[in-house]
Regions:
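An acidic- and aromatic-residue-enriched active-site/binding cleft used to recognize and process polar
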Residues: 12-13, 57-59
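The catalytic Nudix box helix
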Residues: 22-55, 70
Length: 127
């Protein structure tokens, strides 16, 4: 989720705290992946989104599932109310506030790096 040159990052309650994550979740039966994005963002942060743009997918062996990466924009107020049983923290950060991301294969890290690089180099996300 992007808003005014910032990206929404989080730390999952039971996850790693050495790098940021993006909001994520699983599709429910009968739900499109676009509906999943909107629902998961709202459930975890109480934020609404618009202008969803598919980035790419990645097989995820840990849960035997397929990840779908989307960039989207905030639609409405930017006040974050986290789902405390899932998230330890969620906040808006500028590209300059994104600290070094460990070199790993996770799609979420690739997307955060792309946001940072594109915003610094071009002033906008290049998709």
């Amino acid at each position: 989720v992007m808003h005014e040159g910032k990206i929404l990052v989080s730390w999952y309650k039971n996850g790693f705290r050495d790098h940021y994550a993006l909001i994520a979740g699983f599709a429910e039966i009968g739900e499109t992946i676009e509906e999943t994005v909107a629902r998961e963002v709202y459930e975890e942060t109480h934020l609404h989104v618009k202008n969803l743009r598919y980035y790419k997918s990645q097989p995820w062996p840990y849960s035997e599932s397929l990840l779908f990466g989307f960039f989207c924009e905030l639609d409405g107020a930017d006040d974050i109310i986290i789902q405390e049983d899932e998230l330890a923290m969620a906040k808006w950060v500028t590209p300059e506030e994104i600290f070094e991301i460990p070199d790993n294969f996770a799609l979420t890290n690739e997307m955060i790096c792309k946001f940072k690089q594109d915003m610094i180099e071009y002033g906008h996300l290049c998709l």
